[in-house]
Amino acid sequence: GPTGADEASPWVRPPQFDGVMRDGGVLVLRGGAGPNARVVLRAPDTAAVATTADGAGRFELRLPPLSGDVRFTPEVQVGEDAAVSPETLVVIQGGAGPVALIAAGQPTVRLDGAEGLDAVDSDGATLMASGRTNGAAPSVNINGADMAPMAIGRGRWRAVIGRAGPATITVNGKSFDYPGMGAAGGFVVERVGAGWRITWPVEPSGRQTTWLPD
């Protein structure tokens, strides 16, 4: 079996969230981490939220009542080792709005999403639509051009087009009017069109926008 030295190896992996549910007024996040790992969410001006995964690595995190838009940094602690996730968990309007994981250069993971279009990400040069599927490849059309969506694991797909700006995105026959990037500097959450837009800075001097349709 593994020795103590093996268990203290650097392969402590960040938590992977795979869903959110509402239990009364409380948001409950579900996911996986290492067996018996301590999963922690840290946020500015908010007490850290923590739980311990079970022997299979599954965990449920119950968030306290939140107000406004809250950004959490997920991490895992195993013994003396900690792994901070490259993703930021964003809870919009205290959970009344979307719950999503954002990361520079990556398609946004919508924890509260359904089948269809979950998110549209842009860095000003390209536009990336993504969502989840029940197994069949979705039909995706951007500005009249049929796309070939790519499976990216965890039951999700993405389609990338080499241009940015407002667009009409149609997924399985349902159309969405993507409003384009936000102009804001810093971290901004705003209601735009029939959805929410998050704009945040990415290194070294760029920014990324994700739009989360209703």
Task: Describe each PLM feature range.
Residues 1-214:
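Ser/Thr-rich low-complexity repeats and stalk/linker segments
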